[in-house]
Amino acid sequence: MSLPERPGAKASYEQRNSYRKSPSRRNRPNDIEASGYYPVTGGQHQRGPSVNSFAETIRSPNSNIESAPLSPSAEQIEHGSDQPFQRKRSLIRPERNRIDRDHPNYHYRKHAAKMNTLPSSTGNDPVLEDVSGATESGPPSGSNSASGSGVREENIPRKSRKASGRETVAEKSDNTRRRVSTRNSKIVKEGKRKEKIPEQLRPPSAWNVYCAVITFWSPDFIMKCCGMPAKAQRRAWREKIGLISLILIIMGVVGFLTFGFNQAVCGGPVLRLHINSVDRSYMIFHGTAYNLDGSHHPVAEGIPKRLDGTGANVVYDLPEGYGGTDGSFMFQNVNGKCKGLITKAPNSDVPSEGDNLAWYFPCHARNQDGSSQPNMTYPYYFGYACHTTPLARSTFYTQLDKSADVYFTWADIRNNSRNLFVYSGNVLDLDLLFWFNRDQVNIPRRFEELRDKNNAANRAIRGRDATRTFMASGDRQIAECFEDIIKVGTVDTDTVGCIAAKVVLYVSLALILSVVGARFTLALIFQWFISKNYAADKTSQTSDKRKRNKQIEDWSEDIYRAPPRMPGDVGSSVAGASSSDHTSKRSSFLPTTSRFSTVYGAERSARNKSMPTTMASQASGGYMGPSSTAYRETNESRTSFLKSDPYATNTAPIEGPGPSGFIHDSVVPQPPSDWMPFGFPLAHTICLVTAYSEGELGLRTTLDSVAMTDYPNSHKVILVICDGIIKGKGESKSTPEYVLDMMKDHTIPVEDVEAFSYVAVASGSKRHNMAKIYAGFYDYGTQSNIPLDKQQRVPMMVVVKCGTPDEMVKSKPGNRGKRDSQIILMSFLQKVMFDERMTELEYEMFNGLWKVTGISPDFYEIVLMVDADTKVFPDSLTHMISAMVKDPEIMGLCGETKIANKRDSWVSAIQVFEYFISHHLAKSFESVFGGVTCLPGCFCMYRIKAPKGAQNYWVPILANPDVVEHYSENVVDTLHKKNLLLLGEDRYLTTLMLRTFPKRKQVFVPQAVCKTTVPDSFMVLLSQRRRWINSTIHNLMELVLVRDLCGTFCFSMQFVIFIELIGTLVLPAAIAFTFYVVIISIINQPPQIIPLVLLGLILGLPAILIIITAHSWSYVLWMLIYLLSLPVWNFVLPAYAFWKFDDFSWGDTRKTAGEKTKKAGIEYEGEFDSSKITMKRWAEFERDRRARQSQYWGSRENVTGGVRTASGVWASAPPHHHQQQYDEYYSDA
């Protein structure tokens, strides 16, 4: 129970480096690279005195720590007279900045600050500097000079004594204790009153304001009439409407980007006509087609009057047939850019006014293909059809509407039969320059050079874009003049908006395809190459992968079907494991040990590959239990709370009573630390089974499967936590009664077990809860299907939450939820690791585990979490622990969950492929980056603590105070928190782990398999997926804010999580868009290719994944069933879940006797009386127990189990009543 030492630790850093305190040692500056913290005095990091009640604990856990910041400010350092010069703040690393409440390691730093050794963020040995120069007499904390009494020096009742002129903590008088206890209630009430004041004065958040604005049409009095009298209900409903409005906005944005963005930026479908394809209802003027189908020309020469009195239609009624021709010369652009370039010739008949001319070319129509030859004649009079009158010009420019642009492709422009070039996007025809009548107008010589195909100037621009050429050569005016007089069309190009729309389309397509392709490819890479590194080399099952997969598929067909092979059967790879399994070395006739070898096992040579570190294997001298008296020399792993008597020595261990009694006679002995039956060092594991209302058959099969796993019983213990005294629907007994019937060899008779208090995860009076601890061994029962010779002896502990005496008359006494059950274990592990004050329940858990396992709970490194309706394959636990041991960076993992009732109904059938794809595609992809975002609570594993940095240092993972503090949050007042903590607590724990340790890994181990039953009724599925979908959304909202996940920008887990969040929110709209695209593609031609290709890839890749990775071809059928049910998965379930955002009930997933629907998130009434909960350190509980046992308080003879002789040496006291029974097991306490 220490941080950060491991078992087998050597002398403390201060002892190994005694010169550090010597005067001859040179004082070095406090460089920021030397340690993770500014040096502080030893007194600032000493524990405060323990208190007896929870009220005093929450009032002032440690006055010194609260008053002294972890990182002093610059002003504090500056005023120190003997402090060296400090570097500027800009050079301080981020991990050394001030730690506020929003920091992911805030609570860990606060707890670690109370340790005698500060945590190191660099992995180096922590450096303890005594700034003030004051020292204290006696050995430093954590040294090997502690005795086996289990009592700290400052906790031993004794007189005050001086150390370096400073008075140490002395025992409080009885009167002082009574005065403190009477003031507890007043202090707590005063603190609550002060906490309410800032809450009332706090302004509403922007989110609450938005929700109030969006629901202005529903005032409170109307909502009260509609069945929402509570303020919390109304607030949740308003937040639900706010969330739904945001989801609708996101759906609208996605729909706009899918269908409306192109229309908005590119405009409507503009009619564009290809040259030589303009029909006879149009006439072309200056590159633009005009529809003259219903027009009438005024009566003039050559244009007769029709019978209806109107003029003729020029495209149909005239014999010339102007339809489809180019009539640009009939409405010439004169006196514009060409003014000064084209002038009137001498003796010209062209009307003019100064430099202004009436026309430049003969006013004739031309064929659009450019085949017309120049014609200088006029049919009726000179200037016929030139339309020079103001009325004609006004009618043309103002009354005729442009119908379409005439465009040329680059193939048309490069056609050798034409003389075309491009300037500024316009197509210009140089052949039209031959239509100038030189008798009427004068043109520049440059015109003649450019129109001649044999001229070099023409060859330089013909068939090309000559914009840059004209700009650079100074012929810009000539080019602009050409735009006025010889323009025949435009280049086939898109507008800027259309180009932008295409860019957005293809970028989005590439992004989506890259994400889909990357997920598929990396999932395959994980399945083929990475996942096998996590598996154990050998287990009790067959080593043939195909055969094993077939056995798993057969085993998962029925929830009660036994596994194909049990540990110890013939053919098992670990059956009959001999002593050769202790090491991986080959047998040799040469001796492998000498007189210098340790008694705990052969030392590993430096040439050999370093083995993974576990609590048992990291030091061969680590305490491993009662198998030998040699293990009783030291307790390096638990210096903080087991070896706390400063008067003891290592050479003369104190023999005394064990932890609240004796270690069980039938405890499973601990093997040597180098015993590796599976090819990796063993790690001690707690198998947590949370039970609620399960029946006898379900509990039996689950506990049988956990007990029969092939992992050694010496390194696993079953911990069952019953969430209240609940009787399942149709059951004759309550769930705790069924569980207790599955135990035997109790350490304490069942009828003598007392209930102990603890702080529950609830509000109001429900925050105080009581539970009973039962410790013993698993009983397979007389009717067990497991052969007697295969029944293993597995230690087992049961925690039954029975509730306070006031709850006994109510329904479901003791029930606080699954999260509370998990917190019981997590909080216990934290208290054990940090040696903090614990409740009576945690003290009994500590002693119970020690009694049935023979080792301290501090040795446990891993927690397996299994629901009571889940059955585990025999070698799954081994594979999961193998991954944990082989890669210390893994902090959490999960296995594959198989469905046992596949064929019960269509509801269960549509879930088979969904389960498969969520594991082998989603989790496999996330495992490549070590960022699995959802470890299902029914079958997952977490690391309690991990080795870190230098030898003998461990850091808490699941036992981290930040994880425990946030996961045990009992103030659940917002819709977001309620969806996180009340509906998806398992997923929120995964999110907390990733948020607290973004650089560590959470992976999927496909070799670990379990089976469970899924809902076979649609209403139950609807209720379950409502909880899961809402929990997923709110957890992804938490994870998307974690910036330290691997990758950067679009190539990061944060971006993938963001895409997954948006995809979850728009699921109903996405499936609707999919059906729309498919229907439109069938009706309209040509079909939309890109959306169909994208849809085909998204739906087709899972089929390829099945062919490559599936263990059975039946999954192809399950995939087809899943595709048919896509409207249910993507529309019905998400839409229902969104509308039920404010529903925090658990629905019909599990029913209890006499209950209609389970509730969650109930606002409990009453006040929490914290004075009923006693909190002390383990050593203090143990001291009190021994004092009560010996009927004497404060005597050293009774506390330490020894007496002081005349020579001043402490010797062992006479043995107690049970001394002979546990003398061989007990080392120190």
UniProtKB/Swiss-Prot annotation:
Its EC number is 2.4.1.16. Keywords: Cell membrane, Cell wall biogenesis/degradation, Glycoprotein, Glycosyltransferase, Membrane, Transferase, Transmembrane, Transmembrane helix. Residues 1-196, 539-589, 601-648, 1210-1229 are annotated as: Disordered. Residues 43-66, 608-648 have a biased composition (Polar residues). It catalyses: [(1->4)-N-acetyl-beta-D-glucosaminyl](n) + UDP-N-acetyl-alpha-D-glucosamine = [(1->4)-N-acetyl-beta-D-glucosaminyl](n+1) + UDP + H(+). Its main location: membrane. Disruption phenotype: Does not affect vegetative growth. Does not significantly changes in the chitin content in vegetative hyphae, nor in conidia. Residues 137-150, 568-581 have a biased composition (Low complexity). Belongs to the chitin synthase family. Class IV subfamily. This is Chitin synthase 4. It comes from Pyricularia oryzae (strain 70-15 / ATCC MYA-4617 / FGSC 8958) (Rice blast fungus).
